Amino acid sequence: VLRAMAGIVLSLVLMACFLQGAHLFYAGDYVLPISLANAAQLDLLLTAPRVAALTAAFTFLVTIEWLVIGRGAIINARFRWGLALVLLISGIGLQAFVIKNSLRVSPAEIDLTSPGRQVLGSPLAELIDVTKKVFREHKKNQALTEIELNTAARFGISIDQNAQFPLIKPNIYTSPPPLEVDGESGSFRKYNVIVLLSEGLSSRVMQPYSQDYPGLTPNVDDFSRTAMTVDNYFNHTFSTYRGLHGQTCSFYVYFGGGSVIDSASYSCIPDILRRHGYVSSFFYSQYNERTQIDEIMQRAGFDSIYDGKHLGDDYLSSEAANLEIGLSDQQFMKAFIGHLKSAETTQKHGDNDPFYFSLYNIETHALRHPAEDAKRYQGVNSYVLDTIHNYDDTFGQFWRYFQSSPYYDNTIVIFTADHSRFYDRDFRVLVEHQSDYRPIFVDRMPLLIYHPSRELAKNFDANYASSID
């Protein structure tokens, strides 16, 4: 019995250390609540080398456990106890190294100029703690702890967790809007709208916001010459499910964001525009069976939803998908342009209802390497920059087509992101030299708006507003 109990304890400790160590290596932090909340999307990150590494590590752990507590006659008790002692000392040493070198930003002390810090604790204890937090978020009125509520209060945010909508805002503006709207007495021309909710982009590496990596996003930079560039604009939530749903509906999504609360009564942008005669469609590159985006965006009110398979079948002929989960960014934009071309005739004659289109790509996702058809960045050897440069190339294809299309004079184009870039190791090495960068999942995002009237300001300071505003 004691041997079995020892085996269970050792298994838990080893697996916790392995899991926390892997997460620490890639993300610079132990497993986070958002990681567990999005565990169903793990396949986005499982490349062949990572699967091989995970398999090798798991095999090693099982072998070590058998050597320490196994009953095999070929291993004597003295050797097993000696190995156990070595593992114990190594574990203590590793933990000391982690505590000394792996400091994280404390959520209670977030400050863009002087953040507080706190050390990492025991791998097993912290894994248990984060698991408790995730289960607590499933319970009504327990999504936030007292510490988190007090932190919100420090920033002037009052949260009543007993309310149906704890963060409801009773008004949009208390003073005149900063940007005027066409028309008088609330009337306006019904422009089409295309919104690119790009996967995980932070503006700090992109032109026109930054010149740290010249030529990284030349097409977005070119777009900015015609569009209004918004600065100091931050994400209000994360990750993808929360970002897509939260921005479309202007709210904070419950828990991981993958579950849809049908009983809640709220209207989103497609619902509001429908009352003014708009039709809405959402386009994304993944296959619907690999994600919950279909269900989420249906609840957000979109009339039609096109996943990677639908777009591939309709606009890419027999071309095979370049990603195991769907279309590459190159294929996705090619298919979307094909969709726009198919409706050009009605646009020219004005025989159609105004539309609201929203797009979501996948290749710029944290820890994902570019597909084989990607266009690589020639400045710095980094797969992170490759994915951003490749996505910019696809946007350039869209923008060049758009400027010569019937949509140019009747369609608003908004380029932004679902949330900022996650602070994974490979991104941090690119930006940690910037004095205002902090390894937290909140950062400045790109926001550029093209309006056919060409009357928007060249630049606009959002003054630290977020995507919920």
Each language-model region and where it sits:
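Intrinsic-disorder/low-complexity regions
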Residues: I64, I128, K140, L149, ...
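Transmembrane and membrane-interface helices of multi-pass
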Residues: V1-E137
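Residues that form generic nucleotide/phosphate-binding pockets
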Residues: L45, V130, V134, R154, ...
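Short, well-ordered helical secondary-structure segments
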Residues: A6, D29, P33, N38-A40, ...
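Low-complexity, intrinsically disordered short peptide segments enriched in small/polar/basic residues
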Residues: L83-I89, G156, F165, D409
